């Protein structure tokens, strides 16, 4: 990637980030959210598991990488996800991780951890509107495929 391309991507990320923090902009199901995730996660060489913390209006409070793994897996600990969601006083969280292979189809492990997280977060009244998998320039939505 050339320095000019890196600069362009950084400017695009800043623009999308500003847009996602504007009052009234809901984070879930927005094109900007998907673009932001693709720009942030598509080129990663290792799996990363990120959590996007939302308020009651599904507006972005904060987002962070909680876990980093290897080229084909990362270990996710529900306790840590809950702890950070409570720290941010989130009403909801969007889960996101990448597949460095570019294949966005969820694995059995992806489905199982999603179920565990939805159940665990539900115990403390935190909704999970979606879990997104980024692979290359594609995004798979658990919600859109009826898996939540």
Swiss-Prot record:
Q: Which residues form the MPN domain?
A: 26-148
Residues forming the motif JAMM motif are: 97-110
Tell me the Gene Ontology biological-process terms attached to this UniProt entry.
Answer: proteolysis
- Is Protease one of the keywords UniProt gives this record? yes
CDD domains from the UniProt entry: MPN_DUF2466
Membrane spanning segments where?
Answer: none
Sorted keywords for this record are:
Hydrolase, Metal-binding, Metalloprotease, Protease, Zinc
| MF annotations from Gene Ontology | metal ion binding; metallopeptidase activity
Q: Which InterPro entries match?
A: MPN (IPR037518), RadC_JAB (IPR025657), UPF0758 (IPR001405), UPF0758_CS (IPR020891)
Cite the binding residues for Zn(2+). Answer: 97, 99, 110
Its domain of life? Bacteria
Q: Which cysteines are joined by disulfide bonds?
A: none
Q: Which family does it belong to?
A: Belongs to the UPF0758 family.
Q: What is this protein called?
A: UPF0758 protein YeeS
Upper taxonomic lineage: Bacteria, Pseudomonadati, Pseudomonadota, Gammaproteobacteria, Enterobacterales
